[in-house]
Amino acid sequence: MKASMFLALAGLVLLFVVGYASESEEKESPRELLSKIFAVDDFKGEERGCKGFGDSCTPGKNECCPNYACSSKHKWCKVYLGK
């Protein structure tokens, strides 16, 4: 039951993505359309000056992004809840 629901949801998502891409690029060939859908170059990560959740850090230095703090026990950035 869970597998069939997952496959149905995955099929609907794929149908939505293909439909959206075909509407945005009306007169493109299917090969160009598929290359735009599965393009990886557009999703390259940006370099940032701070470290996000789960990144390793050194306690005492301010390396983590805002709203994160370096855990002295685990030595990685975690959500800062305050005291």
Curated annotation (Swiss-Prot):
Xref: Pfam families: Toxin_12
Disulfide partners: C50-C65, C57-C70, C64-C77
Prosegment residue ranges: 22-48
List of residues that carry Leucine amide: L81
Entry's localization field: Secreted
Family: Belongs to the neurotoxin 10 (Hwtx-1) family. 15 (Hntx-3) subfamily.
Further remark: Negative results: has no activity on Nav1.4, Nav1.5, Nav1.8 and Nav1.9 sodium and calcium currents.
Assembly and binders: Monomer.
Function in brief: Selective antagonist of neuronal tetrodotoxin (TTX)-sensitive voltage-gated sodium channels (IC(50)=1270 nM on Nav1.1/SCN1A, 270 nM on Nav1.2/SCN2A, 491 nM on Nav1.3/SCN3A and 232 nM on Nav1.7/SCN9A). This toxin suppress Nav1.7 current amplitude without significantly altering the activation, inactivation, and repriming kinetics. Short extreme depolarizations partially activate the toxin-bound channel, indicating voltage-dependent inhibition of this toxin. This toxin increases the deactivation of the Nav1.7 current after extreme depolarizations.
Name used for this protein in its record: Hainantoxin-III 6
Organism whose genome encodes this protein: Cyriopagopus hainanus
